Amino acid sequence: MLYARDNDHRWGQEGNRVVNVVMLLLSLALPLIHLAVTTGPWTRRNVLRLFLIYAFVFDVGAVGFLFGFIPHVFFADQAAELIGWPKGSMFQFEVGLHDGAWGILGFMCVFFGGGFWLATAIGWSFFMFGAAWGHIHEIIERGNYAPYNFFPAITDTLIPLYLLGLLYAYWRAGGLDGKLRPET
């Protein structure tokens, strides 16, 4: 396997290493802009709903489809090198389809809410926490500091924490279409 270490030339690809952070920042900044330029009854529940929609679109949809599916399926060898995986494995294709499926679900959250949001958030978070554990394991056990292995260990933890935290706050505010409402 190829592993990026120290001052490896690939380590300087800052744009590639921060894509998940950019998506997370967009999912935070765009709803703030949305709130600033629109009027409406901005209750706590409505604000949380808005943040959730942006989080599903950017942190699940874009990350899964644009930055998971497309690289793993159409640029598999380059993605493998950046992660520190062997080239030519069908596993890349399988991972890409998996990411693409979650990406589609993230985009669909614009049209569906309630239990669909809950299932999407829990499933995506389970995958992301598992991916974070895999990245950390690769770092500890194999010294794999390849750009696409090291940095995702952080974002694959932060994104699901943010998404689940938003969903929990939305639920507490009476969201999820009134389903699973907490006792008051």
Residue ranges and their predicted role:
Residues 32-38, 109, 160-178:
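Membrane-water interface at the C-terminal end of transmembrane alpha helices
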Residues 40-56, 111-116:
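Membrane-interface helix-boundary motifs at transmembrane edges
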Residues 81-90, 144-155:
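Non-cytosolic membrane-interface motifs at loop->transmembrane helix junctions
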Residues 66-88:
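Membrane-helix boundary elements
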Residues 110-120, 133-150:
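Membrane-helix boundary connector in multi-pass membrane proteins
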Residues 12-33:
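Hydrophobic transmembrane alpha-helical segments in integral membrane proteins
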Residues 98-102, 120-136, 158-162:
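Hydrophobic alpha-helical membrane segments
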Residues 56-61, 85-101:
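A loop-to-helix transmembrane entry motif
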